[in-house]
A protein has these predicted regions:
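Short alpha-helical segments in extracytoplasmic peptidoglycan/chitin-binding modules
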Residues: 333
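Conserved catalytic motifs of ABC-family nucleotide-binding domains
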Residues: 330
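Serine-dependent protease modules
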Residues: 2-309, 314-318, 325, 344-348, ...
Length: 382
């Protein structure tokens, strides 16, 4: 049995040699990758840094749970039934797209309770030309509603019912909304009351040329939450159950949802609705210009270097705020109060949310040089 010590010595020597070989042959980490210790004796390369425009909030590891948002939003959503009497049948059917077997003409949609004392927000096209409007709340109470005011250029309307202590939603900051975040659409699509659908924000600042007025304000939040006829006027809410927008339109070749729906952002809704409640109408501020999104032809015509976004000033109205501020035709507006202006919807929303008398700081590019101008907005009609 004397050979045992020699055997153990040989095994030990072999193990040491093997470890040395492994360590020598193991490739060193690249210079820009730092080993991170996971547990004693174990290392792995750290992931390469990812470029981010802003830090993201801590997100839960579990799947997104939208039940709380649905519980908060559903009681605040109403069904709006708008009926018309004594008008041309063909005209009204074209407006509302509905004719019941009883011969009654009208339309229906959704709305969201804006305040506990009975103010309700919906779309203008839901109640347009209606003589009798009935609102049904989530608990199946029915109320006659009156129109407080409308703003066709944004497709918004405010209704009032005689009720108190109604549930309503906190407003979300639509400026902070980002593509990829979860949202819910709540309403009465195809007559199915209190329907909740989910999706994500797909894009912001969409202009569909849906509203025919030349100075209409279109800067929609685009989502892929299913929205169908009857959803119009209902809320788009975030995962906290806060009002992020008013569902208004779908992009479809069939008249039914095909993956694209659009909502008026909450910050614009608040600005217009608060005016309607306080004054009976929206008090709009104007610049006194004609504007359009920057196009490749404009870049070439004006010799703009390294500029692919912004809004071109096409005309200036005499005596308007823009003329007083020193704005000129062919100026390229690229920012307002530090907020970037990519295209026409960005600027129309910014001006639409401003009030007459507000002073804005505009960054413009003129002859390839950036400059700051201060503009004092005037009320519409001046």
């Amino acid at each position: 049995m004397k050979f045992i010590p020699f055997t153990l010595s040989a095994l030990a020597g072999g193990l040491v040699a093997a470890l040395l070989v492994v360590m020598l042959l193991r490739p060193a980490p690249p210079a820009d990758v730092h080993p991170v210790r996971r547990s004693p004796g174990e290392y792995y390369p750290a992931a390469a840094p990812v470029a981010e425009t802003a830090p993201l909030p801590d997100l839960p590891a579990a799947a997104v749970d939208l039940r709380l948002a649905a519980r908060r939003a559903t009681p605040t959503v109403v069904h709006v039934d708008a009926r018309v009497e004594g008008r041309d049948r063909a005209t009204v059917k074209a407006l509302f797209g509905r004719e019941e077997s009883s011969g009654t003409l009208g339309g229906e949609g959704s709305g969201v309770i804006y305040s506990a004392d009975g103010y309700i927000v919906t779309n203008y096209h839901v109640v347009q030309a209606a003589d009798n409007i009935t609102v049904t709340t989530a608990d199946r109470r029915r109320f006659p509603a009156t129109v407080v005011g409308t703003e066709p250029k944004t497709d918004l309307a405010v209704l009032k019912i005689d009720a108190r202590n109604l549930p309503f939603l906190e407003l979300a900051d639509s400026d902070a909304a980002e593509p990829g975040q979860w949202v819910l659409a709540v309403g009465s699509p195809l007559g199915l009351v209190s329907t909740v659908t989910a999706g994500i924000v797909s894009a912001k600042g969409r202009n569909l040329s849906l509203l025919r007025d030349p100075d209409a304000i279109e800067s929609f939040i685009q989502t892929d939450a299913a929205v169908n006829p009857g959803n119009s006027g209902g809320p788009l809410v975030d995962t906290e159950g806060r009002l992020l927008g008013i569902n208004t339109a779908i992009a479809s070749r069939t008249g039914r949802f095909q993956g694209y729906s659009f909502a008026i952002p909450s910050e614009l809704v608040k600005r217009i609705v608060d005016d309607i409640i306080q004054y009976g109408s929206y008090r709009r501020a104007i610049m006194g210009v004609e504007i359009s999104s920057l196009m490749p032809a404009d870049q070439q015509r004006l010799g703009l270097r390294d500029r692919t976004e912004g809004v071109i000033v096409d005309a200036i109205f005499p005596g308007g705020a823009a003329e007083t501020a020193g704005l000129r035709v062919n100026d390229l507006i690229v920012a307002v109060d530090g907020r970037p202006v990519r295209d026409l919807p960005d600027l129309t929303e910014i001006i639409g949310r401003a009030r007459p008398g507000d002073r804005l700081r505009m960054t413009v590019v003129r002859e390839n040089k950036s400059r700051e101008l201060t503009i004092d907005l005037l009320p519409a009609g001046n």
